[in-house]
């Protein structure tokens, strides 16, 4: 990949289920801003957002976060 960014809130939520609606909205707005800037800077055609919830889904860090992978 050309780049990888991590987005996480300062306030604790173990996963998306514990995330407040307000924080979820803020996270997606910031993810869009980051994706727009990184896509332009890295000259990518697209990217992936990864967000795992629960051990069975591969979550190993139990603080909500999203990976933006370019």
Cite the ranges covered by each PLM segment.
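HIT superfamily nucleotide-processing domains
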Residues: 1-70
């Amino acid at each position: 990949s050309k780049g990888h960014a991590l987005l996480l809130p300062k306030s604790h939520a173990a996963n998306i289920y514990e995330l407040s609606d307000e924080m979820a909205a803020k996270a997606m707005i910031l993810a869009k801003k980051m994706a727009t800037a990184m896509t332009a800077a890295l000259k990518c055609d697209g990217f992936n957002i990864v967000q795992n919830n629960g051990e069975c889904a591969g979550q190993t860090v139990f603080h909500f976060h999203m990976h933006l992978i370019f």
